[in-house]
């Protein structure tokens, strides 16, 4: 996975440079849609077929997205370059890195909140507000439910993890008692 990230980084940075001259949100939508299409096994199968030309693969990818930017010459060039260089499998990683660049520019970050129980609106808003104060940036939350946590939450922002779950506390106590 690290190799994909390394290979995808220049593509994401170049694309972000193009997006800065226009509408970053629109480019973000386009890249996310292209990444979703590129994840489909059928698309990868067609792309690797010798019976289908590279131009046809590019047209297929662009036809599968709804973004109005799909008709943009730079978007067409990106897709054609990825197809020509057999790099379609990079699109999901390019999308991830593009979002990271976008978040860094906005002073924001994606946060994964794993909770033992569903978080309701006000409860989630309070948690996100306190996390924004702690991490000193705007957070975009994604919530997952994991009953094995027993209680509490595990928060992941980038490479930082804050685990206040009951399961983590029990594991900590077990380590302390057996040491």
Curated annotation (Swiss-Prot):
It is a peripheral membrane protein. Belongs to the ATPase delta chain family. GO terms for molecular function: proton-transporting ATP synthase activity, rotational mechanism. This is ATP synthase subunit delta. It is found in: Cell inner membrane. NCBIfam families: ATP_synt_delta, PRK05758.2-2. Its main location: membrane. GO terms for cellular component: plasma membrane; proton-transporting ATP synthase complex. The keyword Cell inner membrane applies. F(1)F(0) ATP synthase produces ATP from ADP in the presence of a proton or sodium gradient. F-type ATPases consist of two structural domains, F(1) containing the extramembraneous catalytic core and F(0) containing the membrane proton channel, linked together by a central stalk and a peripheral stalk. During catalysis, ATP synthesis in the catalytic domain of F(1) is coupled via a rotary mechanism of the central stalk subunits to proton translocation. Keywords: ATP synthesis, Cell inner membrane, Cell membrane, CF(1), Hydrogen ion transport, Ion transport, Membrane, Transport. Signal peptide: none annotated. F-type ATPases have 2 components, F(1) - the catalytic core - and F(0) - the membrane proton channel. F(1) has five subunits: alpha(3), beta(3), gamma(1), delta(1), epsilon(1). F(0) has three main subunits: a(1), b(2) and c(10-14). The alpha and beta chains form an alternating ring which encloses part of the gamma chain. F(1) is attached to F(0) by a central stalk formed by the gamma and epsilon chains, while a peripheral stalk is formed by the delta and b chains.
